[in-house]
A protein has these predicted regions:
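Charged docking surfaces used in two-component/phosphorelay signaling
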Residues: 15-23
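The feature encodes the CheY-like receiver
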Residues: 56, 74, 86
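C-terminal output helix
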Residues: 15, 106-116
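Residues at the ends of beta-strands that form strand-to-helix hinge/output surfaces
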Residues: 86, 102-103
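Active-site beta3 strand of CheY-like receiver
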Residues: 44-50, 55
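Conserved acidic carboxylate
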Residues: 8, 32
Length: 125
């Protein structure tokens, strides 16, 4: 089963995303801040990470940089999922190392398609 780490501090988003992802057959684990997310990624080795950008403790941009700088986690795809919707926000997320960027509210069909593409591309290591 594909395990997705969802790093998000908003309980409503956690509930909605976990429900939708679980219905699609994904195993979802949650971290509620960037620091906990980096730690969990290192210990759990998820297949993919969904990363909010506006997080407490360590923001999503820095958490992504930390993940991509570590040999343990650099191969794990990171998709930014954020209320930040400007082109500059997308650029910053991609520069930090995110593999893609989705603005909230998220088109779930497009997100699921991206997850499937990343998994079938062999990035699920």
């Amino acid at each position: 089963m594909t395990t997705i780490l969802y790093i998000e501090d908003n309980e409503d988003n956690i509930f909605l995303f976990t429900r939708r992802l679980s219905k699609k057959g994904y195993d979802v684990i949650i971290a509620r801040d960037g620091e906990a997310g980096v730690s969990m990624a290192r210990s759990e080795r998820p297949s993919l990470i969904l990363m909010d950008l506006d997080l407490p403790v360590v923001d999503g941009w820095e958490a992504t940089r930390l993940l991509k700088a570590s040999p343990e986690t650099e191969h794990i795809p990171v998709i930014a999922v954020s209320a930040y919707a400007m082109a500059e926000d997308r650029r910053r997320a991609l520069e930090a190392g995110c593999d893609d960027f989705f603005a909230k509210p998220v088109d779930m069909k497009a997100l699921f398609a991206k997850i499937e593409t990343l998994q079938s591309d062999g990035t699920d290591k």
